[in-house]
Structures are given as structure tokens and as C-alpha cells.
């Protein structure tokens, strides 16, 4: 399960979830000119089999325009610090795995 964290989520989250979510990246660590555009992030995720995780509704719009892959997880849990977001993701690991493995689903909102 490969998650690509958008710039609006701290890169520090990777260390907090690495045991349960290996092979994740933050957009600041991908080989694109920074700051990468949403389209560039989308294309990287598509070419490298990542699911994008973000607070940004712009990826929902891209998903509706382009379809999958990649899949998109939108965090609707605003005003949470990185540790709280990590705790939420760890608690919802089974839901996230099920979403990624279900070929019919395109978007997951996590509250």
C-alpha cells in the first residue's frame, strides 16, 4: 500500500506511520520540481501506483475529470496536528486497505 502525502500534510507524518504504512512518500521527496503542481503530483502517483492523500479538494476535481488511477483519500479532519492525523490513519488502516483494494471505489473521505 503506497500513499503519497500532499504538501498540505506535514512530511513528519511518515515517521509516525511507517510501521503500518510502509512505502509512503511525501510530495517534497518525489523527483519533481518543487513546488509540484496538482497535475504533476497526479501524474507521478498514476505512473508509480500511489494513492494520493490530501486535505485538498482539487484532487477530487481531478479525479472526476480523469478517473482512476490514482485513487484519492481526502482528510476532512481539519485543525488536527500531525500526530492526531497519524492516529486517525492508523485507526482506519483496515478501511484504507479495503478502499485501495476495491477496484470500484475512487475516493475515500476520512473524518
Where are the regions that the model predicts?
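Absolute protein N-terminus
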Residues: 1-2, 111
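N-terminal first-folded block
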Residues: 3-47
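Glycine-rich nucleotide phosphate-binding loop and flanking beta-alpha elements
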Residues: 11, 59-61, 81
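Residues at secondary-structure transition points
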Residues: 32-39, 57, 80, 84
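Acidic, metal-binding active-site segment of PIN/NYN-like and related structure-specific nucleases
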Residues: 49-63
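Glycine-rich loop at the start of a catalytic domain that most often binds anionic cofactors/ligands
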Residues: 64-69
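C-terminal structural segments of small proteins and small subunits
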Residues: 70-111
Amino acid at each position: 500500500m503506497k500513499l503519497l502525502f500532499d504538501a498540505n500534510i506535514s512530511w513528519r507524518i511518515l515517521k509516525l506511520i511507517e510501521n503500518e504504512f510502509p512505502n509512503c512518500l511525501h510530495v517534497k521527496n518525489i523527483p519533481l520540481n518543487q513546488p509540484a503542481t496538482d497535475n504533476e503530483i497526479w501524474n507521478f502517483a498514476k505512473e508509480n501506483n500511489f494513492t494520493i492523500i490530501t486535505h485538498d479538494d482539487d484532487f477530487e476535481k481531478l479525479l472526476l475529470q480523469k478517473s482512476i488511477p490514482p485513487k484519492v483519500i481526502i482528510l476532512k479532519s481539519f485543525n488536527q496536528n500531525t500526530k492526531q492525523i497519524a492516529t486517525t490513519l492508523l485507526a482506519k488502516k483496515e478501511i484504507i486497505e479495503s478502499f485501495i483494494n476495491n477496484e470500484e471505489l475512487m475516493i475515500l473521505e476520512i473524518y
